[in-house]
Swiss-Prot record:
Disulfide bonds: C28-C51, C145-C158, C182-C329, C208-C218, C260-C307, C289-C294, C351-C354, C358-C426, C378-C383, C567-C608, C580-C590, C633-C729, C648-C845, C654-C702, C660-C709, C664-C691, C695-C700, C782-C797, C813-C827, C912-C982, C922-C925
Segments on the Lumenal face: 19-455, 567-1040
Topology feature Cytoplasmic, residues: 477-539, 1062-1076
Outcome reported for the amino acid change (mutating M1053L): In strain: Isolate Human/United States/2/2009
A Pfam family per the record: Phlebovirus_G2
Cellular-component GO terms for this entry: host cell endoplasmic reticulum membrane; host cell Golgi membrane; membrane; virion membrane
Golgi retention signal: region residues: 477-523
Protein name: Envelopment polyprotein
Coiled coil (UniProt feature): none
């Protein structure tokens, strides 16, 4: 706790011992002795300290107006002995400027005792300091300790310090926090002050309070933390904070720019000073004599008044947001600020008051607590997305895509910002129950689902075809009659031409034949032999044309009959990879080492690796269930991008003032800093400096007509401290999200990326061997992640090391910390991002920066780019995954590496009995068929079902249960004998049922199918003709023939009946007409 004290300043008579010689620095001399009996009024809480007032504007006037003051002017060691924070503050270099202490002596500001709510800023080393002062947002505060004590290192309390003596305080025991210069400012009206405050609020939107005083209204704010900020004091209730501003120094021909004194005596009287200024009745330096005029006779009078220009830049004018003010004080210091805390997106939770309802073709999400913002629902390998806005939202999948029981996974976000994720379960119509239309496209594709309607439909179709054929025949006959009249002349001309051609050909053939006869007479014997050979060849010639039509049905059957891979793949592990030994409890302990390849399956399906060893009735399975197959970004080197803002500042100095002695100094380079900026900006920040000529002369507020110097600097800063991690994508590769189930029952979710093995889990590592895929428009996409909130986006970006304007990555930093502060040693940029325009008094800048936040908001995940929907996952390093909206076929398989995976097999056989109760689903499709098996087992084991079309394995529990393994078939009517092996016990089961044909899924708004493997069937546009005939008439050619004959006979009989009824009706109507 800081102990408040009341001390009295020890003073001595105001005798000025020496003023130095003309041209020397003016330093107020002091007496070495002190007069403790003389006291002045002192403010409560101030410690005993001395302030130097040398070479100050109005110093002579101040002394003259305070002639009754009996005190010590000046500090023994001079101002440089006072400590400053930050070190190396620039204003001590300008001895003509007022420090806060000086300004208080002149009555410009008032330093008050720090209260309990005032906070001392962290950063400086306070140990050994007796008095500390810093500007606060609404004043100037001082902290002090009593005699014999000094502040602790952190400044939070006073501690005993034997090296601190009472009486006069040495300068190195006084600490000024901040860089402050003061002057007599010009008051500003209330409306101007309100405009300045409004500008300040817009530049500091995230700052809630400064030193406990509200700047912006915030819903939630952080704890106080230090903030280094530039400010001006215009004499109002509080200071005005600034970021981007400009300063200029003006010189005015007034008494406050000169000091008049008598060498060795002290200040001139008021009358003497007025005479110097108005009549020139004194001597002085060159500037004073040029401005006021010095009489020649006074130049040699060394005892008269001498006036000299105060060696200071002049009076400071600050331009902030286009408003120019002459402040009372201008500074850069550390204050305590609270920042707005943005409510982060709530963690993924179960949605309270949310539930799922199953509707036709999709689901309905009901959110009771808040409206839905967005949601993604996945079932099997189909997904659908929706943007809500209400508490009840319908989300539809592909038409007819979902059949049977389906697990539903829902992830989304509510309007109140909370995220949720929960699972549901829906049972959709399966098999023929999913078809509820008559004489529609699905009816034509699945006649097996309409045992009565299909025959009626066939009869109607045949009758319609017959009628159409009769109509077509009549039309052709009519056309033939009409054509006889129209084409008769043309036919006559063609006949005459043909006759002439035949006669010409006959004459030509006769001539050729005569020539051949003459030659053959001479070679009669050769001709005879040749004739015999020809007769022999004719005996072996073809007896008639080949009947191609007999072979066509066979070829069609061969081409249209397809055998598809199973939806749930089963692979038997090689026994040589398994090493077993006997263990207690009738078990074998086995270790698996080696490698196996599992064929790829589609999302929602499982691939199994079956383990069995000779002599053991038991077997186990390792299962890989594919949850999704997506595109993932294969990241190149990452970098960090700040949410940067362009800044610039400038200071104009007249010629001869400060650094502008002979124009822009040669040493001022792109990395130089003006003294006016000494601690107002981070010297380690990324920026560029320069110096240019400005206006000069009286019109520009300068004594010298030569061009003044405009020192300018442009830089970038990150006021919000928001940083994005940008990861350019070298390529987009396939990755799978899988659920690995070990034979022991342990389950783990993995995300293998193409060509990269996962970490070893219980002796198992998975490598996904996916094919490459190319999508136009994705080559320059980069993953972007906001490091604070975790928001992710996809957008084009620059390659590492190439800061090209117009893309994300114009500024690239090597670390988060470098990006927060945009350090020059850790960031690169293009200096053209911030343009600079020089004006008469200052320089203004314009920004060409690309807003990273705006780009991220535009392409925020979830998003659809180049026909690919991108979502944000919950696992893995690469958190963005893409799903092509169009049906995408890829190839791939899983490589499973084993390094000592443990496996336990029972040596006791199980007794299994059961039957197949139902088969439903689709054939030659992506989802496959579901086989219902009711089994009773004497123990937990593994069941292996092998049919002619497919085989599968599933876990069997002790007792009676119903299991629904998935299998794949390539025909509509199933009638197969299967073998069930359950824990060493084998039995035969009969599998009968009908499956439906599933079309390639049709899209609805917001719905898409996840990427699937090309080796697994995915449906088609039309059924296989053989499957369709089997579904219509039954399995086998005999049934086809009988069915076709039956349909034709039915059509004939129906035709006869219809004709008979028609004739009878016509005859009846005719007889009635005659009677009438």
């Amino acid at each position: 706790m800081i102990v408040p004290i009341v001390l009295f300043l020890t003073l001595c008579p105001s005798e000025l011992s020496a003023w130095g010689s003309p041209g020397d620095p003016i330093v107020c001399g002091v007496r070495t002795e002190t007069n403790k009996s003389i006291q002045i009024e002192w403010k409560e809480g101030r410690s005993e300290k001395l302030c130097q007032i040398d070479r100050l504007g109005h110093v002579t006037s101040w002394l003259r107006n305070h002639s009754s003051f009996q005190g010590l002017i000046g500090q023994v060691k001079g101002r440089p002995s006072v400590s400053y924070f930050p070190e190396g503050a620039s204003y001590p270099r300008w001895s003509g400027l007022l420090s806060p202490c000086d300004a208080e002596w002149l009555g410009l500001i008032a330093v008050s005792k720090a209260g309990d709510t005032d906070m001392i800023v962290p950063g400086p080393t306070y140990k050994g300091k007796i008095f500390v002062e810093r500007p606060t947002y609404n004043g100037y505060k001082g902290w002090g300790c009593a005699d014999g004590k000094s502040l602790s290192h952190s400044g939070t309390y006073c501690e005993t310090d034997s090296s601190v003596s009472s009486g006069l305080i040495q300068g190195d025991r006084v600490l000024w926090v901040g860089e402050v210069v003061c002057q007599r400012g010009t008051p500003v009206p209330e409306d101007v002050f309100s405009e300045l405050v409004s500008l300040s609020q817009s530049e500091f939107p995230d700052v809630c309070k400064i030193d406990g005083v509200a700047l912006n209204q915030c819903e939630q704010e952080s704890i106080p933390q230090p903030l280094d900020v530039a400010w001006i004091d215009v004499g109002r209730s509080h200071k005005v904070l600034m970021r981007e501003h400009k300063t200029k120094w003006v010189q005015e021909s007034s008494a406050k720019d000169f000091v008049c004194f008598k060498v060795g005596q002290g200040p001139c009287s008021k009358q003497e000073e007025d005479d110097c200024m108005s009549k020139g009745n004194c001597h002085g330096d060159e500037v004073f004599c040029r401005m006021a005029g010095c009489s020649a006779r006074m130049q040699d009078n060394q005892e008269g008044c001498r006036c000299e220009l105060l060696q200071k830049p002049g009076e400071i004018i600050v331009n902030y947001g286009g408003v120019s003010v002459r402040p009372t004080c201008y500074g850069f210091s550390r204050m305590m600020a609270t920042l707005e805390v943005h409510k982060p997106d709530r963690e993924l939770t179960g949605c309270t008051g949310c539930h799922l309802e199953c509707i036709e073709g999709g689901v309905k999400i009901v959110t009771l607590t808040s409206e839905l913002r967005s949601a993604t629902v996945c079932a099997s390998h189909f997904c659908a997305s929706a943007k809500g806005g209400s508490k009840t939202t319908d989300i539809l999948f592909h038409t007819g895509a979902l059949v049977g029981p389906n697990s539903i996974r829902i992830t989304g976000q509510l309007l109140d910002g909370s995220k949720f994720s929960f699972d549901g379960h829906c049972i959709f119509p399966d098999g023929c129950m999913a078809l509820d239309c008559t004489f529609c496209k699905e009816f034509l594709r699945n006649p097996q689902c309409y045992p009565v309607k299909k025959w009626l439909f066939l009869v109607v179709v045949i009758m319609c075809c017959y009628c159409a054929l009769m109509l077509l025949t009549n039309i052709l006959r009519a056309i033939g009659v009409w054509g006889t009249w129209v084409f008769a002349p043309i036919k006559l001309a063609l006949a005459l031409g043909l006759r002439l051609a035949k006669l010409s050909k006959k004459g030509l053939v006769a001539v050729v034949t005569r020539g051949q006869m003459i030659v053959n007479d001479e070679l009669h014997q050769v001709r005879v032999e040749r004739g015999e050979q020809n007769e022999g060849r004719q005996g072996y010639g073809p007896r008639g044309p080949i009947r191609h039509w007999l072979y066509s049905p066979a070829l069609i059957l061969i081409l249209t009959t397809s055998i598809c891979s199973g939806c749930d793949e089963l692979v038997h592990a090689e026994s040589k990879s398994i090493t077993c030994k006997s263990a207690s409890g009738n078990e074998k302990e086995c270790s698996v080492t080696g490698r196996a390849l599992l064929p790829a399956v589609n999302p929602g399906q499982e691939a199994c690796l079956h383990f069995s060893v000779p002599g053991s009735p038991d077997s186990k399975c390792l299962k890989i269930k594919v949850k999704s197959i997506n595109l993932r970004c294969k990241q190149a080197s990452s970098y960090y991008v700040p949410e940067a803002k362009a800044r610039c500042t400038s200071v104009r100095r007249c010629r001869w003032a400060g650094d502008c002695q002979s124009g822009c100094p040669t040493y001022f380079s792109s990395n130089s800093f003006s003294d006016d900026w000494a601690n107002r900006m981070d010297r380690a920040g990324l920026g560029m400096s320069g110096c240019s000529d400005g206006c000069g002369g009286a019109a520009c507020g300068c004594f010298n007509a030569a061009p003044s110097c405009i020192f300018w600097r442009k830089w970038v800063e990150n006021p919000s401290n928001r940083v994005w991690k940008v990861s350019p994508c070298a390529s987009w590769v396939l990755a799978a999200t899988i659920e690995l189930t070990l034979p022991s029952g342990e389950v783990k979710t993995l995300e293998p990326v193409t060509g990269q093995a996962t970490q070893m889990f219980k002796g198992v590592a998975i490598t996904y061997l996916g094919s490459s895929i190319e999508i136009v428009g994705m080559t320059r996409l980069c993953e972007m992640k906001e490091m604070g909130t975790g928001i992710m986006a996809l957008a084009p970006c620059n390659d590492p090391g190439h800061a090209i304007m117009g893309n994300v990555g114009e500024i690239q930093c090597s670390s988060i910390e470098s990006a927060k502060h945009i350090r020059s040693d850790g960031c690169i940029w293009n200096a053209d991002l911030v343009g600079i325009e020089l004006r008469v008094d200052d320089a203004v800048c314009f920004s060409k920066l690309t807003s990273v936040e705006a780009v991220a908001n535009f392409s925020k995940i979830p998003a659809t780019i180049s026909g690919v929907r991108f979502d944000q996952g919950n696992h893995g390093e690469s958190r963005i995954y893409g799903s092509p909206l169009d049906i995408t076929r890829v190839s791939g398989e899983f490589s499973v590496s084993f390094r000592g995976m443990r496996l336990k097999l029972s040596e006791i056989s199980a007794s299994c009995t059961g039957e197949i109760t139902n088969v439903s689903g689709c054939y030659s499709c992506m989802t496959g068929a579901s086989v219902s098996i009711k089994l009773h087992s004497s123990k937990n084991t593994t069941g292996h079902l092998k049919c002619d079309s497919d085989e599968t394995a599933f876990s069997v529990m002790e007792g009676t249960h119903t299991y629904r393994p998935h299998m794949s078939f390539d025909k509509a009517v199933i009638d197969e004998e299967c073998v069930l092996n359950c824990g060493g016990h084998s039995s035969k089961l009969l599998l009968k049922g009908s499956l439906v044909f599933m079309d390639v899924p049709r899209f609805v708004d917001g719905s898409y199918v996840q990427t699937y493997h090309s080796k697994v069937p995915a449906g088609g546009r039309v059924p296989n003709p053989v499957d369709w005939l089997n579904a219509l008439f039954g399995d086998g050619i005999t049934r086809w023939i009988l069915g076709i004959i039956g349909v034709l006979l039915a059509c004939v009989m129906l035709f006869v009946v219809v004709v008979a009824i028609t004739r009878r009706l016509i005859k009846g109507l005719t007889q009635r007409a005659k009677v009438a």
